[in-house]
Amino acid sequence: MYATFTGPVNRNAQLWAALLYAGPGAVLSHETAAEVDGLVDRPSALIHLTIRAGRYLQAAPGIRVHRSRHLRDLRFPAGELPRTWIEDTILDLAETKSGLDDVCGLVTAAFGRHLTTVPPFRSVLAERKRQRWRREISELINAAADGTHSVLEFRYDRDVERAHGLPPSRRQVPFRKRTGPGDSATACTSRMA
């Protein structure tokens, strides 16, 4: 690949070059798709691409190639980077996580950043019969639908409220807090009210 402009090659150009190298049907995936969609804040050192299972692609420096039987036909507007759907990205990343808190962080970040909603996420999870953390992800989707936005909230719901039979708290409820005598009320957001 050759750049047709002067100066440093920016991240967007690197991603397009990797996609062109991989050929038709290749999409950004895993950490790289998460980066493009805003699920993670920092770019990964490697560019992750997914191609259909059964296809061969010689390794290249800085590129990690994944193969998938789950790769769907994707259509993106001209000029937009082809990548896995956010739900597929989350499930692909969940496969690589060693702990539930990491998986929980992915799912709650996706809902908290308004990158997905419950129906499409449930649908994609249902298609993946051998998904690692499947039961836990299903539980996380339900918790996110109820307003859970963090690992801490999920742990509190599961390990404290439900485990001890406590009444459920209300999530993400605005309340008014006075800072002192004569001070005006300040709107805040709290997990419990």
Predicted feature descriptions by range:
Residues 141-155:
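A short, highly charged nucleic-acid-interacting micro-segment common to nuclease
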Residues 1-135, 157, 164-166, 170:
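Short gly/ser-rich loop at a beta-strand->alpha-helix junction or flexible surface loop bordering the NTP-binding
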Residues 148, 160-162:
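Charge-rich, low-complexity terminal tails
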Residues 132-144:
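A short, surface-exposed helix-loop junction/capping segment
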